[in-house]
């Protein structure tokens, strides 16, 4: 425990909170255009081909967004909406593409957790 004199000489430092999604600039979502759609492999110990897209946002940022769900219709020049949320086993992927918004279609034949994948209610 520091003395009063030590605290006068060097005050306590406040914790600086680092922004985990800087490209959103405090907005809940941002729009962007896909510049490249590709698959990448996750870190150890996982193994898969994860679908991701490089996106140029309206504010000029270039980010990598994860495409959730099974199957997608994205290609170069598709207009997408992104939200924050990293993918733990993909380094550098700090954003998710929102399904069912703008050019991104919802997941087909989705019965549960439909709102997360932009799927309409089955008849």
Curated annotation (Swiss-Prot):
<dbReference type="GO" id="GO:0003735">
    <property type="term" value="F:structural constituent of ribosome"/>
</dbReference>
<protein>
    <recommendedName>
        <fullName>Small ribosomal subunit protein uS12</fullName>
    </recommendedName>
</protein>
<dbReference type="InterPro" id="IPR005679">
    <property type="entry name" value="Ribosomal_uS12_bac"/>
</dbReference>
<keyword id="KW-0694">RNA-binding</keyword>
<keyword id="KW-0820">tRNA-binding</keyword>
<comment type="subunit">
    <text>Part of the 30S ribosomal subunit. Contacts proteins S8 and S17. May interact with IF1 in the 30S initiation complex.</text>
</comment>
<keyword id="KW-0699">rRNA-binding</keyword>
<comment type="function">
    <text>Interacts with and stabilizes bases of the 16S rRNA that are involved in tRNA selection in the A site and with the mRNA backbone. Located at the interface of the 30S and 50S subunits, it traverses the body of the 30S subunit contacting proteins on the other side and probably holding the rRNA structure together. The combined cluster of proteins S8, S12 and S17 appears to hold together the shoulder and platform of the 30S subunit.</text>
</comment>
<keyword id="KW-0687">Ribonucleoprotein</keyword>
<dbReference type="GO" id="GO:0000049">
    <property type="term" value="F:tRNA binding"/>
</dbReference>
<dbReference type="InterPro" id="IPR012340">
    <property type="entry name" value="NA-bd_OB-fold"/>
</dbReference>
<feature type="modified residue" description="3-methylthioaspartic acid">
    <location>
        <position position="89"/>
    </location>
</feature>
<dbReference type="GO" id="GO:0006412">
    <property type="term" value="P:translation"/>
</dbReference>
<comment type="similarity">
    <text>Belongs to the universal ribosomal protein uS12 family.</text>
</comment>
<comment type="function">
    <text>With S4 and S5 plays an important role in translational accuracy.</text>
</comment>
<dbReference type="Pfam" id="PF00164">
    <property type="entry name" value="Ribosom_S12_S23"/>
</dbReference>
<dbReference type="GO" id="GO:0019843">
    <property type="term" value="F:rRNA binding"/>
</dbReference>
<keyword id="KW-0488">Methylation</keyword>
<dbReference type="GO" id="GO:0015935">
    <property type="term" value="C:small ribosomal subunit"/>
</dbReference>
<keyword id="KW-0689">Ribosomal protein</keyword>
<dbReference type="InterPro" id="IPR006032">
    <property type="entry name" value="Ribosomal_uS12"/>
</dbReference>
């Amino acid at each position: 425990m520091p003395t009063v004199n030590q605290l006068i000489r060097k005050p306590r430092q406040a914790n600086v909170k680092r922004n985990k999604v800087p490209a959103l600039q405090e907005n809940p979502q941002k729009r962007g255009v896909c510049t490249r759609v590709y698959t990448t492999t996750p870190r150890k110990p996982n193994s898969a081909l994860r679908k991701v897209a490089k996106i140029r946002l309206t504010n000029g940022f270039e980010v990598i967004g994860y495409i959730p769900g099974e199957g997608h219709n994205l290609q170069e020049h598709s207009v997408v909406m992104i939200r924050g949320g990293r993918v733990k086993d993909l380094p550098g992927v700090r954003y998710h593409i929102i399904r069912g918004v703008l050019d991104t279609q919802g997941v087909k034949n989705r019965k549960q957790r439909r709102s997360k994948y932009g799927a309409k209610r089955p008849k």
